[in-house]
Amino acid sequence: ISTAENNNNVGRNLYYYIIDKVTKKYLGTICMSSDYLDLTPRDNYIGWTREKKTDDKMINYTTVGSTIVPTQPLGFNYVGGKLLALLCLSDKVQNDWKKLYGDRLVSVTTTSLYGKAKAGGMSQYDNLKHWKKMGYSQGSVAYKPKKETTKRLRDWLKKYHSEKYFEWYVALKPSGQPYKRDHKNRSHQFAFSKLGIDKSIVRSEHQRGIYYSPLYTNTCEFLRGEISEDKLVKSFDTSTEYLVCLLYTSPSPRDSFR
């Protein structure tokens, strides 16, 4: 349903097929992953530091909608992308996150596909209730090398920079996860730099829109460590029924719960 190649994220991942109850047809697919560690507009909105995110592990209480892809013609004719974006906030996702990882989900992030480059910077998330536009990413996105190029880069690192190779591709944390976060991109950028390859060849100045949905009225206070989990106050109804009605019924029969 998409021409984009799927690349599994390192860390947490929840996968969903969205299926219509009546017709049993597939409406789209969603993947909820470990959230981005650094998104300046979002981080400024929350008011947290990198130390709070990592040392106190508050980043584990947030997630990113890394894949939000509707099937067609639902996506084009019936704003299916907006439907899937709302379902990323659902009780189902929150409960699965808590059950599988043990952390309460308090907010959701996502980024637009095209950013400023298309449609005047508008995306399927604009003007969508419960999603706040934070701004744009800094706009430096690495191109993905072909498999053959990736293999040659790894072989080169292993031969000429064995310590770095071990750090990125062999060493593991006690949890079994890679020792270095985002190790593939880091290793590629290191190799490109050492080989004298110009950044304009391997990176695109492509800015993406950043969107954020706090699930509680005091999500930011919680992520800053100012309140405990038991003090969280629900921001809006996150049942599947409400979220679907919110998009396809106006006004929603349950819109009084905000």
Feature names for model-found ranges:
Residues 12-14, 21-162, 166-167:
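Acyl-donor binding region in acyl/amide transferases
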Residues 248-257:
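Conserved small/polar residues in nucleotide/adenosyl-binding loops
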Residues 18, 32, 211-213:
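Short beta-strand element of the conserved SAM-dependent methyltransferase core
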Residues 198, 202, 206-247:
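A positional "C-terminalness" feature that preferentially activates on distal terminal regions of long
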Residues 144-208:
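Long, charge-rich alpha-helical interaction segments
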Residues 1, 93, 97, 153-157, ...:
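Generic structural signal of hydrophobic/aromatic residues within well-ordered alpha-helices
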Residues 1-14:
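Short, basic/aromatic recognition patches
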